[in-house]
Every structure is written in C-alpha cells, then in structure tokens.
C-alpha cells in the first residue's frame, strides 16, 4: 500500500529528471552541428509533463535569424524525443559564456 501512495505522490510532485535522461538531453542538444556547447540545464517532470530549459552556446558571428533557426531545430529534436515537453532555450554567444557566473546548483551542467 505504501508503494502505491509513494507512486501517487511522486506523480503529483515536481521531480528533477534522472541523470540518464539529463545526459540524453545534453547529447541531443550538443549533436546539432552548429552548437558549440550547452550549459545551465534545468529539467523536471510535473505529472505527465516534462520541462526542459537550457542555454545553447553558438558562434558569435551568427545572425539572429541563424541562431533562432538553430535553437528551433534543437527544440524540435528535443520535443521529438520528449513528446509534449515544454522546451525553453536561451541562446548565448560563445564568447560570453566564460564570463558568466555559474550558480552553484548548476556547476555540473557545464
């Protein structure tokens, strides 16, 4: 009985995605030929919905339209792997990534 209660409770509460799924998200994002890196991955599951947020590191010289298109392609690939997922992608020029302070809770996501 306790296991049923625990599973029901887990389903209602937000949970960070397991490490294996987070690693898969990183592989998917970094697989795009124009992505130079990614960081600040945040992921969670709330009920049946998966939420994915990350920063893509892109070439400084891309136009806004090019960067937007790359972001869309990564988003669509993630949504294909996680149907129904809410995906938010922030784009960073590669030159500013080293200068950004990293919050302690994200140190392992660089």
Regions found by a protein language model. Name each.
Residues 1-110:
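Alpha-helical transmembrane segments and adjacent TM-loop junctions that form the membrane-embedded core
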């Amino acid at each position: 009985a306790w296991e049923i209660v625990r599973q029901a409770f887990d389903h209602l509460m937000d949970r960070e995605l397991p490490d294996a799924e987070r690693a898969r998200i990183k592989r998917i994002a970094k697989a795009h030929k124009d992505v130079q890196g990614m960081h600040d991955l945040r992921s969670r599951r709330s009920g049946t919905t998966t939420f994915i947020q990350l920063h893509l590191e892109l070439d400084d010289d891309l136009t806004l339209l090019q960067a937007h298109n790359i972001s869309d392609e990564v988003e669509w690939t993630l949504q294909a792997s996680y149907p129904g997922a809410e995906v938010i992608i922030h784009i960073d020029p590669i030159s500013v990534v080293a200068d950004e302070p990293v919050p302690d809770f994200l140190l392992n996501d660089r």
